[in-house]
């Protein structure tokens, strides 16, 4: 698939998500495509991930600021905006709606094969998102700091 075509597919992904057309979103990816949230390590199916964000931010919108394609890879610098009016899935457990507005820059790294997205990795500042939601940006239960080992104590 040509590089320009891959960039167009990713732009179409964001347009479909903005319309909350999850059938179209899913049609742009392979059936086994996975999304990895790099900050948390969470992995979901492609449609499941898109639906999770749409549930958490029903008025959400993605603005693709820069989309760069090279071979099978498309990197998209984006800004996501929306109101947290639904449950947000997180590795520490579900976060109930806060009613707070969020504006979050993020970067998506997509891999495509034969005109379909096969995997995506999303990079974003979880601390900024948690602060905008009015929640602690501290470590989650799975990331609790540990005491230094005896040889590292002063």
Where is each model-derived feature located?
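C-terminal and inter-domain tail/linker signature
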Residues: 1-154
């Amino acid at each position: 698939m040509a590089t320009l075509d891959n960039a167009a597919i990713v732009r179409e992904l964001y347009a479909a998500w903005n319309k909350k057309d999850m059938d179209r979103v899913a049609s742009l990816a392979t059936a086994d495509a996975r999304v990895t949230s790099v900050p948390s390590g969470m992995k979901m199916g492609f449609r499941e991930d898109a639906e999770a964000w749409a549930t958490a931010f029903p008025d959400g919108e993605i603005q693709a600021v820069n989309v760069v394609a090279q071979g099978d890879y498309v990197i998209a610098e984006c800004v996501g905006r929306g109101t947290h009016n639904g449950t947000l899935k997180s590795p520490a457990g579900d976060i109930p709606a806060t009613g707070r507005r969020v504006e979050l820059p993020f970067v998506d790294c997509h891999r495509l094969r034969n005109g379909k997205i096969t995997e995506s990795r999303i990079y974003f500042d979880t601390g900024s998102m948690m602060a905008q939601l009015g929640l602690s940006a501290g470590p989650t239960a799975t990331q609790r700091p540990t005491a230094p080992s005896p040889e590292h104590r002063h």
